[in-house]
């Protein structure tokens, strides 16, 4: 039974270190699952740091994951969609590749930190949550076709003056899966995300001010059904939106107090629940949420440092 699983395994690893400038690690793991049988997981990591300014990391390997359709996606039960789970769902299997570079550039007597990352995942086996083939159904099925994920991220951070640091980050994603024989964008995955953070702490460390501006890229929604008027019940895509968060903190000897606000731009997703007035009807769906459902939120709080008391 899948609710009981025994997984003994063994792992071997080899590490090569050359003057702390080049490090190579190769590993191989073998496991036996009482449910899924035997599987082997290779992994390799390389780190090259020729100087204090630059370092490069790369990794590659295979990964496995046991799936639990409803436990991982129980939010989908908050709709009128019929749930169909194929009996032949297998363990997920994928190859993972990644490379990252870090630069520490001296600039005007300070250090500019730059980080670049790229990751690629290629699924060989995957549990697909198909909400496209039938708008009134959610179908958990085995992957039949391609499924992959590309992620690129760039981040820069610089202390312009004492106590003030500005950080900017941008992430671009390309995630696609085969649904009903068609390779499509995965729903609810934003195409990009941008982040700009400014943080300032007064010279004595008494006050701290944090401001974060976040840009969330648009994405795809599952296939819609047609209303009687001949129009779709919801749009096929959602647009990008911005969010502004602010927090002010006052530090004391053993405690601190903070006040702030989230989503100060006041953005709210319009009509997040489909057919909300008829929760027992065949068209009710509260699972198509992709953005905040509340406007600006304000808060105040207190922190205690127990280690100093």
Name the predicted role of every residue range.
Residues 2-33, 39-43, 158, 162-174:
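Surface-exposed extracellular loop regions of Gram-negative outer-membrane beta-barrel proteins
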Residues 6-8, 28-34, 60-66, 73-75, ...:
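Transmembrane beta-strands of outer-membrane beta-barrel pores
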Residues 10-16, 44-48, 99-103, 154-158, ...:
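Residues on the lipid-exposed face of transmembrane beta-strands in outer-membrane beta-barrel proteins
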Residues 15-16, 30, 38, 48-49, ...:
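Residue-level signature of outer-membrane beta-barrel architecture
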Residues 17-21, 114-122, 142-224, 303-308:
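Gram-negative outer-membrane beta-barrel transporters
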Residues 19-23, 49-53, 94, 105-109, ...:
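Outer-membrane beta-barrel channels and translocator barrels
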Residues 49, 55-57, 88-148:
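Membrane-embedded beta-barrel scaffold of Gram-negative outer-membrane proteins
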Residues 217-224, 249-309:
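C-terminal beta-signal and adjacent terminal beta-strands/loops
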């Amino acid at each position: 039974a899948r609710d009981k699983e025994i997984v003994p395994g063994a792992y071997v690893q080899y590490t090569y270190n050359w003057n702390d400038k080049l490090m190579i690690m190769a590993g191989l793991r073998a496991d036996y699952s009482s449910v899924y049988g035997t599987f082997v997981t290779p992994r390799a990591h390389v780190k090259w740091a020729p100087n204090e300014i630059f370092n490069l990391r790369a990794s590659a390997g295979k990964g496995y994951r046991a799936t639990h359709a409803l436990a991982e996606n129980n939010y989908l039960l908050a709709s009128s969609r019929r749930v169909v789970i194929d009996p032949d769902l297998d363990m997920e299997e994928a190859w993972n590749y990644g490379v990252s570079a870090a630069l520490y550039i001296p600039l005007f007597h300070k250090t500019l930190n730059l980080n670049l990352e790229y990751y690629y995942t290629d699924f060989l086996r995957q549990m697909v949550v198909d909400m496209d083939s039938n708008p009134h159904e959610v179908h958990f099925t085995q992957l039949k076709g391609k499924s992959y994920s590309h992620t690129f991220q760039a981040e820069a951070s610089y202390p312009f003056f004492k106590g003030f640091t500005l950080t900017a980050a941008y992430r671009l994603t390309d995630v696609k899966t085969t649904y009903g024989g068609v390779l499509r964008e995965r729903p609810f995955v934003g195409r990009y995300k941008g982040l700009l953070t400014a943080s300032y702490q007064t010279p004595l460390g008494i006050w701290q001010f944090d401001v974060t501006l976040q840009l969330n890229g648009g994405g795809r929604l599952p296939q819609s059904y047609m209303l009687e008027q001949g129009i779709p019940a919801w749009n096929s895509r959602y647009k990008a939106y911005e969010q502004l968060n602010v927090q002010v903190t006052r530090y004391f000897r053993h405690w601190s107090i903070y006040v702030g606000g989230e989503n100060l731009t006041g953005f709210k997703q319009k009509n997040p629940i489909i057919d909300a007035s008829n929760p027992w009807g065949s068209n009710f769906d509260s699972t198509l949420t992709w953005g905040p459902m509340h406007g600006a939120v304000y808060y105040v709080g207190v922190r205690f440092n127990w280690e100093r008391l």
